Amino acid sequence: MAEKIDIEASKNEDFNKLKLSDLNKRLHTIYQGGGEKRMAKLKAEGKMTARERIDALLDPKSPRIEIGAFAADGMYKEHGGAPSAGVVVVIGYVSKRQCIVVANDATVKAGAWFPMTGKKNLRAQEIAIENR
């Protein structure tokens, strides 16, 4: 009986590791924003990415969490996709005060808004209001 449980637990662990690996691959793609080409163009112009701008604003080594990285995942394929709905939202600390920061991602359709972009911005505002 214990052997059967161990085999089942091992199968579950392998399944979960595979799913976690898939999620991490998807996140890596999402973090590329509009793609390597657009990221390179942004860098050539001397600009920072949305995530870099947020990191520069937030207190160093302070806790932070990104909200909605998977927003619009798989949507708007006819437009080339909209990773993170074209906007990065992070809860973090500025001058030791917790806040929510929103930055448009210029690498995603030059910062154009999609319907999910508006929803994500509204959700960021709701979170800020709920946690005043």
Please place each PLM-identified region on the residue numbering.
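Terminal-region recognition feature
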Residues: M1-R132
